[in-house]
């Protein structure tokens, strides 16, 4: 029995002339021709003083707004006039001509005539109208056009459009362009019209794509001078986010300190004094305004010097610089007399100092970051190892240690301008292998080994202004082979095979716990880089050197595992300096 074809199937070889996209396109073309000639139209849209005869059915098919409007209305004998007004008086394209032009583009799209956008202002006006009328496809077409036209010159204007219509991808792209081309963006008129909060947010961004901080300072001052009487009150607020210590010293003297607006602003004086102190005494490790922005030619790098191999038998000759952002290692000249061990290392005025050690215990070497070479400087009066160094008020302090017979009370201070060491007040209790850190203008010596080899929990505090020591609240541990760094007025202590990172607040004399480490180490390298505490290498609980690296972020309280060191090492030097990435 012969079976018939299903109703929806057509005979083989036959084409349905009333189906398919071509037919739909012909219908739309006919409707668009009727619209332009006013044929069979049943509604009039009015915008900017112009009338646009249209078909309700076509508008309802292409616009959620008109579909809802016409479905709720009652049939009328003649064509109704529907005013199409902007969303808000300040919306793009709100002039009469702009409103009419935007509606013409929307109607072309609804009737299938295509869309040809020529400028960002036009696209923004059409986007606003398409958003209001619920023409989804046209909205996406406008967004694609704006993304394709995004440049430094219009990034601020398009960011406002993105914010107005909640266009997250466009806003993100605008933000990228703003950061990458900030110096160019700041030269355009749109930048001068930003609100104070917007300027502050830009200046505070650590990812600004500027080669030098001078560009940030000049942008801030250009914005203020655009309307100085009204904006001079924002100077302090803006200058807080300019990293003045990163300016060239000559530029700072000629352009910043000599600026009339800044000279008249008493609120700005502490910031200028802070920058001047950094130029003279050296930067404070971890201070935000002394850290290069992420995409500068300059960057903070971690310098790792020498140390002992896995079994502690060999003294490593290497010195390397590590850039955490790119995870790139760069070899540096080896420290002369590398066979020394248990030396102390510290950074002062962006140079690296290494003092003492088990062999040549009086020697002090300086690695000049400018000359990229090691230079021998004045020797210690008292040879020592298992000591520590720290910087307070631009001077280097060598504290305690061991001379082969006894733990040392001795403290020496180094003046880099005269290249001389002088005795400072001795420690109340002699210690070696203690943690030493400077914070709030004072020196703190935490824990360590006393005479007889017994560990202590004492915290000894030195005030360089009075050349006097005092005792603070004892640490919640008694350990040696400790390390400490300070960051934002807090001291972080670790090492000593302790499983935790401890905190000490010199202002309140209170101890606390910050985080738990994945594995305990001692004699590790600890430094602050990019606002985080980096813990590199050290000896594990089996007495072997490790290549593990951890970072602790005080802002989140999280400890993260980082890529390993190039080799296992312990009892090494570890400091942070600023270096050109092109070197």
Swiss-Prot record:
Coiled coil: none annotated. InterPro entries: BACK, BTB-kelch_protein, BTB/POZ_dom, Kelch-typ_b-propeller, Kelch_1, KLHL35_BTB_POZ_dom, SKP1/BTB/POZ_sf. One of its GO terms (molecular function) is ubiquitin-like ligase-substrate adaptor activity. Transmembrane segments: none annotated. GO terms for biological process: proteasome-mediated ubiquitin-dependent protein catabolic process. One of its GO terms (cellular component) is cytoplasm. Residues 146-248 form the BACK domain. Pfam families: BACK, BTB, Kelch_1, Kelch_KLHDC2_KLHL20_DRC7. Kelch repeats lie at residues 301-350, 352-394, 395-441, 443-489, 490-531, 533-579. Residues 41-119 form the BTB domain. Keywords: Kelch repeat, Repeat. PANTHER family: KELCH PROTEIN (PTHR24412), KELCH-LIKE PROTEIN 35 (PTHR24412:SF187). This is Kelch-like protein 35.
């Amino acid at each position: 029995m012969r079976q018939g074809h299903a109703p929806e199937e057509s005979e083989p070889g036959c084409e349905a002339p009333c189906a398919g996209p071509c037919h739909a396109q012909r219908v739309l073309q006919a409707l668009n021709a009727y619209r332009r000639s006013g044929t069979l139209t049943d509604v009039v849209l009015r915008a900017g003083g112009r009338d646009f005869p249209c078909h309700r059915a076509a508008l309802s098919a292409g616009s959620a707004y008109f579909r809802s409007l016409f479905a709720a209305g009652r049939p009328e004998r003649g064509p109704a006039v529907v005013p199409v007004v902007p969303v808000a008086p300040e919306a793009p394209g709100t002039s009469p001509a702009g409103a009419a032009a935007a509606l013409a583009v929307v109607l072309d799209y609804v009737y299938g005539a295509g869309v040809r956008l020529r400028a960002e202002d036009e696209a923004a006006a059409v986007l606003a109208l398409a958003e209001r009328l619920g023409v989804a496809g046209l909205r996406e077409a406008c967004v694609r056009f704006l993304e394709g036209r995004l440049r430094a010159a219009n990034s601020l204007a398009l960011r406002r459009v993105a914010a107005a219509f909640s266009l997250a991808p466009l806003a993100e792209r605008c933000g990228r362009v703003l950061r990458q081309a900030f110096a160019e963006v700041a030269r355009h008129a749109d930048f001068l019209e930003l609100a104070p909060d917007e300027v502050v947010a830009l200046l505070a961004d650590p990812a600004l794509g500027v080669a030098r901080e001078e560009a940030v300072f000049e942008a801030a001052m250009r914005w203020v001078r655009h309307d100085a009487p009204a904006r001079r009150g924002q100077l302090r607020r803006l200058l807080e986010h300019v990293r003045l210590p990163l300016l060239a010293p000559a530029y700072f003297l000629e352009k910043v300190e000599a600026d009339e607006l800044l000279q008249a602003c008493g609120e700005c004086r502490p910031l200028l004094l802070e920058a001047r102190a950094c130029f003279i005494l050296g930067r404070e490790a971890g201070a935000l305004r002394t850290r290069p922005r992420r995409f500068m030619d300059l960057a903070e790098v971690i310098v790792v010097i020498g140390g002992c191999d896995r079994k502690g038998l060999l003294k490593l000759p290497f010195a390397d610089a590590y850039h955490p952002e790119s995870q790139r290692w760069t070899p540096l000249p080896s420290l002369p007399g590398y066979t020394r061990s248990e030396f102390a290392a510290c950074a002062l005025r962006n140079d690296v100092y290494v003092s003492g050690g088990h062999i040549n215990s009086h020697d002090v070497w300086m690695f000049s970051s400018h000359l990229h070479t090691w230079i021998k400087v004045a020797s210690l009066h008292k040879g020592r190892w298992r000591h520590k160094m720290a910087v307070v008020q631009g001077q280097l302090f060598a504290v305690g240690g061991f001379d082969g017979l006894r733990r040392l009370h001795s403290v020496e201070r180094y003046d880099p301008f005269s290249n001389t060491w002088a005795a400072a007040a001795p420690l109340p209790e002699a210690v070696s292998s203690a943690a030493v850190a400077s914070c709030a203008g004072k020196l703190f010596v935490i824990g360590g080994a006393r005479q007889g080899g017994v560990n202590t929990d004492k915290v000894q505090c030195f005030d360089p202004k009075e050349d006097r020591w005092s005792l603070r609240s004892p640490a919640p541990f008694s350990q040696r082979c400790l390390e400490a760094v300070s960051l934002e007025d807090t001291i972080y202590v670790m090492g000593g095979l302790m499983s935790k990172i401890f905190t000490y607040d010199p202002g309140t004399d209170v101890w606390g716990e910050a985080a738990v480490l994945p594995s305990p180490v001692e004699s590790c390298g600890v430094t602050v880089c990019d606002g985080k505490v980096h813990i590199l290498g050290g000896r594990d609980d089996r007495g072997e050197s490790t290549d593990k690296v951890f970072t602790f972020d005080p802002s989140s309280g999280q400890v993260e595992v980082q890529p390993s060191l190039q080799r296992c090492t312990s009892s090494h030097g570890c400091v942070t300096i600023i270096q050109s990435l092109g070197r």
